[in-house]
């Protein structure tokens, strides 16, 4: 699946400082590192981009395009910044994101058509985040139909199910996964993405990686097209390339409910097994899930 | 065609815990099925237990109809506790060490511990002891209480994420059971039990997931207790198999609704208590003896 590198994110102190000072160096270092690591897209997350939106996003786009040939994902809630960013990208960019919310349908969505970009569509509506598979389906069918009517085909649309942290709402993890599984049946030809690192938000920092990687493998089994993730996680890139077939097949076996003898596993395999069980919803999550 | 009701059986068990000593000993929990599922297989060896809340100082904010049953003893915690044990058929007394609040009277650990011992010795039922929830003060108070009441087998709490180590150590050293408290979050609940379990026996832990009153978040407590119970009994998660305490009296009686009339107050406490019983609470701390009587009657008839 495609990896959209998430490191250039306005919440990072390094990034926000560099953007504030218009210092290209830290930004370019991150762009180069992600490119070298094997990312397929570079995400530029500006957040709400309230201050000088057009100038800021265009500076960011130009700065990053100086050092990488990868296509960009422009990630902001601000339609003014979004338009300014999309309009100058050298390669066909990804509009990250629009949703079923009224203001987004009216102001964000049409930009994908205007600038001929790929489009991330999330399941959000004016009522917020749908709480289960059924309501996600209902919401996305409506939003995709709206996009289709504007002339945007399914092949250019990447659906985001909105992923919540396992430590906040364990049940939603299963709902998002189930939704991604059903997606190809209800919207043939449609693509997908997801904010992978959300799964581990709130979990102690050193334990976040294995949650991200395991969930990625689980999503991949159902044909996930892309993830917005930490491209600098070597093991994540490696897993995605199929370079760790034992781990991948172990995760699949646990997903299938197979009884696996723990004593036959290495420490790493045991960790992936336990993590899969938590993400499946079979084991109640706690920060100590690897110790039990 | 005759309808045959399905009968479920589960393989998990809620741990049984004993508090109090000798003739006073009280067993809590131990069930191998879901709350009130008498129609399923499995056993419910102990009925729900009820305690009344007693303060170590005269409360100033309680409604007059709440103070009414205790009005002649409310300034003497020992007499108050004795009255609960003697007149109101409690299974246990819950002593709230309200005066140790550093923002209020800031009673010393020594004084609180001495009083606790007097109360424990005066009553013929086991004693539950709650600190005020002040992270630092509770460590001093509960450790001292544990030491001074060595051998009484109290149920002590709250032990929280920020201070459980020291409190658990004192409880273990002096033979008391522990209340592990987390703020309405099942994942944090499990986490605290795992952490505690490293140095304190899981079969001496009671879970307090925090009980919210009707209209003020009761459904959060309800779903949490229900989930914890199901995870333990159905899915055999050892870190959710502890008995549950619902310390709901204070939460209910501080509501605007409970302060409007006696009847409404009793109903507020009663509905909250009944709901949490159905969710899986094994021991409940109430404030009004009439609520306690009402609940026992409901359970008896059911």
Report each predicted region and the residues it spans:
Chain B
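Acidic (Asp/Glu)-rich catalytic clusters
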Residues: 85-88, 117-122, 143-150, 166-174, ...
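N-terminal amphipathic alpha-helix/helix-capping segment at the start of soluble metabolic enzymes
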Residues: 1-71
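Active-site mouth loops of central-metabolism enzymes
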Residues: 49-79, 104-107, 131-135, 157-158, ...
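Short, well-ordered coil/turn segments that N-cap beta-strands
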Residues: 46-48, 89-91, 123-127, 150-154, ...
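Catalytic alpha/beta core domains of metabolic enzymes, predominantly
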Residues: 162-299
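Phosphate/pyrophosphate-binding betaalpha-module
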Residues: 133-135, 139-142, 147-159, 164-166, ...
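Glycine-rich, proline-tolerant flexible connector loops at the mouths of alpha/beta enzymes
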Residues: 61-65, 89-119, 123, 129-136, ...
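Alpha-helix-loop-beta-strand connector modules within alpha/beta enzyme cores
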Residues: 104-130, 143-151, 226-246, 301-302
């Amino acid at each position: 699946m495609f990896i959209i590198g998430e490191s250039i994110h306005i919440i990072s102190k390094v990034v926000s400082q560099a953007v504030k000072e218009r210092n290209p160096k830290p930004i370019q270092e991150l762009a180069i590192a992600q490119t070298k690591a094997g990312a397929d897209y570079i995400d530029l997350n500006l957040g709400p981009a309230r201050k000088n939106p057009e100038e800021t996003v265009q500076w960011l786009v130009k700065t990053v395009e100086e050092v990488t040939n990868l296509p960009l994902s422009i990630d902001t809630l601000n339609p003014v910044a979004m338009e300014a960013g999309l309009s100058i990208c050298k390669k066909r960019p990804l509009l990250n994101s629009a949703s079923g919310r009224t203001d987004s349908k009216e102001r964000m969505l049409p930009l994908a058509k205007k600038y001929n970009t790929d489009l991330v569509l999330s399941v959000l509506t004016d009522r917020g985040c749908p709480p289960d598979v059924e309501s996600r389906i209902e919401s996305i069918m409506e939003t995709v139909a709206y996009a289709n009517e504007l002339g945007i085909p399914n092949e250019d649309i990447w659906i985001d199910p909105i992923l919540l942290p396992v430590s906040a709402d364990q049940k939603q993890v299963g709902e998002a996964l189930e939704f991604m599984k059903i997606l190809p049946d209800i919207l043939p030809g449609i693509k997908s993405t997801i904010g992978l690192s959300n799964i581990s938000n709130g979990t102690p920092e050193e334990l976040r990686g294995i949650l991200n990687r395991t969930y990625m493998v689980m999503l991949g089994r159902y044909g996930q097209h892309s993830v917005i993730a930490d491209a600098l996680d070597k093991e994540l890139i490696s897993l995605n390339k199929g370079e760790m077939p034992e781990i991948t097949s172990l995760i699949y076996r646990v997903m299938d409910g197979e009884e696996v003898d723990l004593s036959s596993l290495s420490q790493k395999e045991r960790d992936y097994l336990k993590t899969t069980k938590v993400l499946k919803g079979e084991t109640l999550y706690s920060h100590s899930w690897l110790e039990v | 065609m005759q309808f045959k009701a399905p009968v479920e059986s589960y393989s998990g068990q809620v741990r049984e815990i004993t508090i109090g000593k000798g003739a006073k000993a009280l067993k809590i929990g131990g069930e191998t099925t879901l709350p009130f599922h008498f129609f399923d297989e499995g056993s419910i060896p102990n009925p729900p237990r009820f305690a009344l809340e007693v303060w170590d100082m005269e409360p100033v904010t309680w409604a007059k109809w709440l103070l009414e049953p205790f009005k002649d003893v409310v300034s003497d915690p020992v007499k108050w506790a004795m009255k609960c044990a003697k007149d109101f058929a409690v299974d246990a007394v819950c002593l709230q060490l309200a005066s140790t609040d550093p923002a209020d009277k800031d009673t010393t650990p020594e004084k609180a511990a001495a009083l606790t011992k007097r109360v424990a010795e005066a009553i013929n039922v086991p004693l539950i002891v709650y600190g005020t929830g002040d992270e630092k003060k509770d460590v001093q108070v509960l450790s001292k209480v544990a030491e001074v009441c060595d051998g009484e087998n109290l149920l002590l709490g709250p032990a929280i994420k920020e201070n459980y180590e020291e409190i658990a150590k004192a409880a273990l050293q002096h033979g008391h059971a522990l209340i592990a408290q987390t703020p309405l979050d099942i994942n944090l609940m499990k986490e605290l039990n795992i952490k505690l379990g490293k140095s304190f026996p899981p079969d001496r832990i009671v879970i307090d997931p925090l009980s919210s009153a009707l209209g003020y978040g009761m459904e959060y407590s309800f779903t949490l207790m229900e989930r914890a119970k199901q995870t333990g009994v159905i899915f055999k998660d050892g870190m959710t198999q502890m008995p549950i305490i619902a310390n709901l009296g204070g939460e209910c009686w501080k509501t605007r609704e409970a302060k409007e009339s006696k009847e409404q107050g009793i109903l507020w406490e009663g509905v909250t208590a009944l709901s949490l019983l159905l969710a899986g609470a094994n021991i409940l701390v109430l404030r009004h003896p009439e609520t306690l009587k009402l609940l026992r009657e409901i359970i008896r008839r059911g």
